[in-house]
Amino acid sequence: MKVSWPGENHWQVGPAVVESPAVGAPQVGGLPDVVPEGTLLNMVLKRMHRPRCCSYQLVFEHRRPSCIQGLRWTPLTNSEDSLDFRVSLEQATTEHVHKAGKLLHRHLLATYPTLIRDRKYHLRLYRHCCSGRELVDGILALGLGVHSRSQAVGICQVLLDEGALCHVKHDWTFQDRDAQFYRFPGPEPEPTGTQDVEEELVEAMALLSQRGPDALLTVALRKPPGQRTDEELDLIFEELLHIKAVAHLSNSVKRELAAVLLFEPHSKAGTVLFSQGDKGTSWYIIWKGSVNVVTHGKGLVTTLHEGDDFGQLALVNDAPRAATIILRENNCHFLRVDKQDFNRIIKDVEAKTMRLEEHGKVVLVLERTSQGAGPSRPPTPGRNRYTVMSGTPEKILELLLEAMRPDSSAHDPTETFLSDFLLTHSVFMPSTQLFTALLHHFHVEPADPAGGSEQEHSTYICNKRQQILRLVGRWVALYSPMLHSDPVATSFLQKLSDLVSRDARLSNLLREQYPERRRHHRLENGCGNVSPQTKARNAPVWLPNQEEPLPSSAGAIRVGDKVPYDICRPDHSVLTLHLPVTASVREVMAALAHEDHWTKGQVLVKVNSAGDVVGLQPDARGVATSLGLNERLFVVDPQEVHELTPHPEQLGPTLGSSEMLDLVSAKDLAGQLTDHDWNLFNRIHQVQEHLRDVTTANLERFMRRFNELQYWVATELCLCPVPGSRAQLLRKFIKLAAHLKEQKNLNSFFAVMFGLSNSAISRLAHTWERLPHKVRKLYSALERLLDPSWNHRVYRLALTKLSPPVIPFMPLLLKDVTFIHEGNHTLVENLINFEKMRMMARAVRMLHHCRSHSTAPLSPLRSRVSHIHEDSQGSRISTCSEQSLSTRSPASTWAYVQQLKVIDNQRELSRLSRELEP
């Protein structure tokens, strides 16, 4: 071995490497934490002068020319927490990406032999490469779940970041252009056509697709702040919402940070980021990797990981660095905020912030905002208003009551404030606390009644009570489907009704707020006769009659409802119990105790179609409605759990329904699916996720329907043995997706498209080749809506252009709510983080927007759905559209779409797919 300063002469150290098998080449990323005595590396370090932050090169002889560069010596104490580079997760991920790159390289060469070739550009020859545009075209043409060019660019960026793809000029950003050339490193892979390699390729593309959005985000961060686009700034802001280091900052600060964040990568473990005593100029957030915190005298103090931050004191004062920060692993990425940028942001935000204090404590924080302002949009002069940032629940409610206006429009900021509060109050202000506060405000007198006339005093009280009634009216309209079973709520409403009945002005106001009272009012004005019982009622009716449920809640599962619990025994016999939907496992077991052949000591578990068993905790509730697709409940002795086998019905059908589907046109099938989905979607309440005693069975039922549809598509295609019929069925499913999109049923549209992109279906190359060019072109156009890049930006833009009624892509909406909840603290300095509530309300309000015109037909069959149930003979009359070719009755089709039978075991689908096309 030879040691040298970079660029200088070498000198010999120790015996040759080939004579010391104990050493070998260290893992990429630097020296191990402990160097054994007597090894060659130990002797090298003993003879080398080791000043801080000096780099060396170790050049190995008797091998092909290579060296390890950038080795740094840092005095670290030996610790059990030292990272073992040889088994690091990062290296394992890199290996998977390299393997995926080789598989993709092999498949591209087999499919497009002329893709990789010599290129000549501007009088220069580039050997064995392809252009960025051709590479993206090739990946899209493979049909492996990549639906858009931006998604393919993300995959290529992942390969480029990990070294599985190289730019001929070593640029770090992948560009989808003809004049940018890339090559796969290493020798050309040998062609192979085994089924195992094909499955590995599908898994590899799934891995690359999963990491693609992160790679695109990294590209946006690497750009200089002044070159970032509006979309990139929004993407960075959304990423900041999920970083715990900035969770305490307001959204205004986060938006400003998105414009000044700098990306700082470091490749080698052991690199000193800064040393104790250095001048602090930046704040660091760990985006990837980990660091060790070392101080003089104490050595290793702690280890920081992804999401942690350090150096923030440097932004507050000019104190020197209190510790030394050393990279703990390779390839660490940091988000850096320079002091001058952060101080400017904080100064600007503080200038817009107003704090209200009571008894020496802050109880309300307001921020002056400009309407229309954003991270990349300048504020509009003269359109400033104050919004609530945080506060105590009581002060937020008090401000809301003061800000409400009787003549406000639906788009007024005050109305949005009211909606935000009502949709989220259960998170920070339970209903009992809200009732108490409202009754207190109803009775409260002005602070200084002598300051005005008696008429002004009376007007003030009346106006405030009117605001309370408006708020309660909106609250009742939102929560009315759940209030009949809430004795506390009904008691509060009765108390308020008694108080209102004593004031004629308030009674008249309340009478005009409710449709039932408006009808009575029209009758009393001469439009009809009113019964004496109606005239005798002085107390306003807050809730609709329980016998006349709201249209949106018809058929919804409520807290007190009983649902069937189908419980299997090990011998596959089934026992059905009817229990409350929110019954706990303990209550289910107690009900089973009254049945024969049941012994104490048995447990309740759920089993899926693959035979996987999951135990259920005694306190778990709603297990019947929360079962996944093809899951069943089993009661079994603990020692027999591992012997359980799925019920035969869980395995799915063995024969397809292609003959039946041939009798129904794609348009009419889409109409029936949309009718059924709309019924399920309309039963979901906007706020059921946030209420403690409200079941989520309706939401779970709708989500299970999504999974059912995508596996239904894959099941029917895999169970169609005739190639011609299978191609015809594939064509129908593509047209079905197009009609679902046209009918604005985006949830089922995504489900059908996901089913078509299932690996068991996408591999059926001969079936896809049978499709006409026009149909394949239609499928490619539909795939663009599935593009997940930039946080599903294509879908979100398309959704904003649709007028209601719409059935949105529900999994994405739930993901948004989950990310908002987990990425933001509910309490900030012991105050309610109302910014978080505002974001959650905005996401949940999408449900209301999509259903705001629920009476409009979504499909050609919408107006005839009721007749299907009422009169089976009448339903035989054709209800198809003019262009429909259906010969099957709508009633039988309706029954079919409600009870789809599917195979959800991916291994079984893959097996069937290989039998169709080996």
UniProtKB/Swiss-Prot annotation:
UniProt: 3',5'-cyclic AMP binding residues:
311-314, 321-322
Membrane association type: Peripheral membrane protein
Nucleotide-binding is among the record's keywords: yes
Give me the ranges of the annotated region Disordered.
369-388
- Name where it's found: Cytoplasm; Membrane
Domain of life of the organism encoding this protein: Eukaryota
Write down the SUPFAM superfamilies for this protein, in alphabetical order: cAMP-binding domain-like, Ras GEF, Ubiquitin-like, Winged helix' DNA-binding domain
Q: Which residues carry this modification: Phosphoserine?
A: 79, 531, 859
| Molecular functions per Gene Ontology | cAMP binding; guanyl-nucleotide exchange factor activity; protein domain specific binding
Give the residue ranges for region: Interaction with PDE3B: 218-242, 398-422
Q: Which Pfam family, any one, appears in the UniProt record?
A: RasGEF
Which stretches make up the N-terminal Ras-GEF domain? 384-521
GO-annotated biological processes: angiogenesis; associative learning; cellular response to cAMP; establishment of endothelial barrier; negative regulation of syncytium formation by plasma membrane fusion; positive regulation of angiogenesis; positive regulation of GTPase activity; positive regulation of protein export from nucleus
> Do the record's keywords include Acetylation?
no
One Gene Ontology cellular component term attached to this UniProt record is:
filopodium
Identification of the protein by name: Rap guanine nucleotide exchange factor 3
